[in-house]
Curated annotation (Swiss-Prot):
Keywords: Chloroplast, Electron transport, Membrane, Photosynthesis, Plastid, Thylakoid, Transmembrane, Transmembrane helix, Transport
Protein's cellular compartments: Plastid, Chloroplast thylakoid membrane
Official protein name in the record: Cytochrome b6-f complex subunit 8
Record GO cellular component, one term: chloroplast thylakoid membrane
TM segment ranges: 5-25
Origin species: Acorus calamus (Sweet flag)
Length: 31
């Protein structure tokens, strides 16, 4: 159960990081 929570937290963190990174790149490239 603990591993599931940790892996889920990591997955959520990666999703947020990837989303924010792509958003920054998209915004800087000239919307």
């Amino acid at each position: 159960m603990h591993m599931d929570i940790v892996s889920l937290a990591w997955a959520a963190l990666m999703v947020v990081f990837t989303f924010s990174l792509s958003l920054v790149v998209w915004g800087r490239s000239g919307l």
